[in-house]
Amino acid sequence: MNDPGPRTGGVVEEGRPAPDFTLTSDSGEAVTLSSFRGAPVVLYFYPRDDTPGCTAQACGIRDVWGELERKGAVVLGVSPDGPRKHAKFREKYGLPFTLLSDEDHAVAESYATWVQKSMYGKSYMGMERSTFVIDAEGNIASIMRKVKPADHADDVLAALP
């Protein structure tokens, strides 16, 4: 169940409402972003489960989980991988947060994270590693594009109130 909600044309800016969506989680449940109003949300987009950079990014967040909980933050990771693959990834690395499947990349498009990439001279569409910190009212408080997995957790903590 991938419902990106109203289309925003890929325009997202700090201070504006975060595009709402409903995606399927690693446990098979439908998760809607707006259901977390009242708490800050760390919404991070990543290319693929169980790859070096994505694993470092996820484990970095896991390693500061206690601090994120103290700040009352909800963490949602989003990639094009399916719920089963997410469940295996989450279990393998003991990730305490929810992973969401955006298999048709509609939500990534609404957040402008589904972008043109290139590798070895080939051009293709793929997920840009990006994070959005959404405040308790549902507005985008901070946008981090092309994040570095090694520094990501510290940057997320610094962006939270």
Residue positions per predicted region:
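Chalcogenol-based redox active-site neighborhoods
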Residues: M1-P161
